[in-house]
A protein has these predicted regions:
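Conserved, well-structured ligand/cofactor-binding cores
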Residues: 1-353
Length: 353
């Protein structure tokens, strides 16, 4: 799934339909973990969480452990995230789970698909997560909605999840082996919102390039600051592409001017004070548009790559690899996404200056 495919589901109304091969991989991983976990100590299945990982959980309590994890961490505050952010979270979780590393039950995957395709959105507050241990609080609220508790929105109206699911004809999920932990433990919130940010940043850049082209034309600018030769002297793809797009935008213009036909042709005029009556070169803010928007384009593209890499990663702890074992680690950590969002924020500010 690329950015366009992601956005088509979140904003464009396209359906989410996992392939049979993806579902079979997830089923195989869950079946493997169910058998592999017998007689072994595995975090989040028969242990507590975080600093309570040293506490053994009796087999009779393991299912309720998953529910209690979701309910206890659904403690966020602040305004509700918009529906597009919730849908992005649902989709990121679904894509990640289809990699098999979280070993979730089929019911979780069916639930995520049903919520996406019917437009059911659990209520998720914007404050509470820190990213360093995954988006625990936001994803706990997502999980709360998936099990049919809490509140949500459907067709523009907020209500209890039980009423929403009845109206939408959707069933809540039931949590199995480590489903609660899998829903909480990862970067779905920051990754989903990050991909939306990248999409909107591209749109803003398109407008910025169009406005820069318009300014170049209405000010009757010299056109050599956009030349392929000048911008090709810098080895930055973003600058070169911005200049190319601006050249295409003003192609055939009767307002922009060719320097060789005037200042380089001995036609320059000087007033009584010895000052050229024509600008020798364009104002700084005009002739540096490719050098300003080019780095912005490069930054957005790099953010897109990192966010798509995260989308197609397994961001969970533990990691289940069928026929190879279970691995404990820190793939839930969100710095990869967070640093890209810091850079993207600077780029967006630059566009608006």
């Amino acid at each position: 799934m690329d950015l366009d495919g992601f956005i088509s589901i979140i904003l464009g109304g396209a359906r989410f339909s996992p392939s049979n091969a993806e579902l079979e991989l997830a089923d195989r991983s869950h079946a493997y973990l169910s058998e592999y976990a017998s007689g072994k100590v595995i975090y989040g299945i028969n242990t507590g969480f975080g600093p309570m990982a040293q506490v053994a959980i009796p087999e009779a309590d393991r299912r309720s452990l998953q529910y209690n994890l979701v309910r206890s961490h659904a403690s966020g505050a602040g305004a509700d995230l918009p529906d597009e952010a919730i849908r992005a979270m649902l989709l990121v979780r679904a894509v990640t789970f289809l990699k098999g590393g979280s070993a979730v039950t089929r019911g979780v995957l069916d639930g995520l698909s049903n919520y996406l395709n019917t437009g059911v959105c659990p209520t998720v507050p914007e404050l509470g997560g820190v990213g360093a241990s995954g988006d625990l609080v936001q994803q706990a609220h997502l999980g709360l909605g998936l099990i049919g508790e809490g509140t949500g929105t459907y067709q523009g109206k907020k209500d209890s999840m039980s009423a929403i699911l009845k109206a939408a004809g959707v069933s809540p999920i039931e949590l199995g082996l480590r489903d609660g932990l899998a829903i909480l433990n990862g970067t779905a919130c920051m990754t989903g919102i990050g991909l939306l940010n990248v999409h909107h940043a591209y749109r803003l850049l398109d407008h910025s390039i169009a406005m820069g082209s318009l300014l170049t034309e209405v000010l009757c600018s010299w056109d050599d600051h956009l030349s392929e030769t000048l911008n090709g002297a810098k080895r930055h793809a973003g600058q070169r592409e911005v200049a190319e797009r601006m050249r295409a935008n003003i192609a055939g213009s009767k307002l922009t001017r060719d320097r060789s036909g005037h200042l380089y042709a001995g036609k320059e005029e000087v007033d009584a004070n010895g000052v050229f009556t024509e600008l020798v070169q364009e104002h700084y803010s005009i002739r540096c548009i490719p050098q300003i928007l080019g780095p912005v384009l490069d930054t957005i593209r790099n953010a897109e790559k990192v966010l798509l890499d995260e989308l197609h990663s397994v961001d969970d702890n533990t990691l289940t690899v069928a026929d190879h074992g279970v691995f404990h680690g820190g793939n839930f950590h969100g710095d990869q996404v967070a640093l890209e969002m810091d850079k993207l924020r600077l780029a967006v500010v630059k566009m608006c200056m």
